[in-house]
UniProtKB/Swiss-Prot annotation:
Coiled coil: none annotated. It comes from the Bacteria. GO terms for cellular component: cytosol. It holds the Pfam family UPF0149. It comes from Pseudomonas putida (strain GB-1). This is UPF0149 protein PputGB1_5261. InterPro entries: YgfB-like, YgfB-like_sf. Belongs to the UPF0149 family.
Amino acid sequence: MPNTQSPYIAFAMLLSSNGHPVTPAELHGLLIGRSCAGAGFDADAWLADAAQLLETEPGDTVRNALIGLQEMVKGELNSDDMAIVLLLPSDDAALSDRATALGQWCQGFITGFGLNAGGKDLSDEAKDVLQDLVAISQVQEALEESEDGESDYMEVMEYLRVAPLLLFSELAKPAAPAPKPSLH
């Protein structure tokens, strides 16, 4: 039985009860994708991108949740942990549900990245990450309820916790300030 107290389910219920036909995974992917493309962390710009996916302007409760999500992501991307926490169903959800959400997360990421990358030059490694995300978004139905399927899911999820950081460090991470010249 799925954990009704999980952040994913709570966010899904909030979105659904406010008439937004989108999953938390897709919204989180959108946010991470746009952030990794260098969109910055301006709340109004994030809310404008999110409103396209939500299909309507968010009310105050959803708006506040989206701003909170952005603050969490900002902290993760700017920390030294070198991993992000994916907003996905908990481990007690059916593997098919988790795999579907993983694919939706990747679709959201690709959309967010595409809306904000604006023709930036990418390294070969960054292009490989984007190709991987496209492939993962399309194979969500391929995982079977088995130990191998579970293992494959965990492997992909671990990859997605670190791979976007390559894009963020390449395109969005602020450069370290140059040392100030000293006066002699």
